[in-house]
């Protein structure tokens, strides 16, 4: 059985299940690297995968948690409604575009709700670390009001339909998969820096199907 939920729901559910001693997942796989590693610190079973030699050193943590993907964080935009010349190629360009056309972008920019999405919170923290002008950039981006969501799917739907025009800090893997069959959805990577995440996976110490969990992780 595979349960798909956002990173905050995953964290809270796993913590609750461990505290109650009830049935829980054999494997945890989270896009929120910080909360994923927090769970691994407290609950991961040590397992040296035979595939470990195929991974870069940074993707292995104490033979317990593994970074399983390499996913850039991107902007998305509506190709029908955003002229090619306006497509932002940096966070600064995005902020400048929105600040210069506040009427057009009023409530038309979407991103993660950092109160409900652990991934969204993590990306905001990393933006702050990477961008010395983070708070000014954020203030300009938010001038017309932000439409926030707890997961990537609704953001892509809203941008594709035109309900929103631009999405900030979306996972490139989801955006690329959607854009292959959605002519309205465009993708742009910021040139001054691009955040990259790796989904964290580990086997629970309380796994009831340990062999199957090892095979799945491998």
Language-model features and meaning:
Residues 84, 119, 175-178, 195-198:
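Short acidic/glycine-rich loop or secondary-structure boundary segments that cap or lie
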Residues 19-20, 46-47, 184-186:
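Short, hinge-like loop/turn segments at secondary-structure boundaries
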Residues 3-11, 15, 23-163:
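Extracytoplasmic ligand-binding site segments that recognize negatively charged/polar headgroups
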Residues 153-161, 165, 179-218:
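Extracytoplasmic/periplasmic substrate-recognition and gating elements
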Residues 18, 126, 178-181:
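Active-site catalytic pocket residues across diverse enzymes, especially alpha/beta-hydrolases
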Residues 171-172:
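Glycine-rich, charged/polar anion/phosphate-binding loops
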């Amino acid at each position: 059985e595979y349960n798909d939920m956002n990173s905050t729901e995953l964290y809270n559910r796993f913590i609750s299940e461990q505290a109650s001693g009830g049935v829980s997942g054999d494997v945890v796989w989270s896009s929120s690297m910080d909360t994923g590693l927090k769970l691994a610190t407290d609950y991961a079973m040590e397992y040296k995968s035979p595939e470990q030699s195929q991974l870069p050193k940074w993707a292995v943590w104490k033979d317990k948690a593994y970074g399983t993907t390499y996913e850039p964080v991107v902007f998305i935009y509506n190709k029908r409604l955003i002229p090619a010349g306006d497509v932002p190629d940096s966070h600064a360009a995005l902020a400048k575009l929105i600040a210069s056309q506040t009427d057009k972008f009023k409530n038309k920019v979407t991103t993660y709700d950092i109160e409900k999405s652990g991934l969204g919170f993590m990306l905001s923290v990393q933006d702050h670390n990477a961008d010395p002008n983070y708070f000014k950039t954020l203030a300009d981006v938010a001038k017309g009001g932000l439409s926030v969501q707890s997961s990537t799917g609704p953001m892509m739907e809203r941008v594709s339909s035109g309900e929103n025009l631009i999405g900030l800090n979306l996972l490139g893997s989801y955006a690329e998969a959607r854009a292959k069959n959605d002519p309205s959805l465009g993708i742009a990577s910021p040139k001054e820096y691009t955040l990259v995440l790796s989904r964290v996976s580990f086997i629970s110490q309380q796994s009831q199907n340990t062999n199957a969990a090892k095979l799945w992780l491998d």
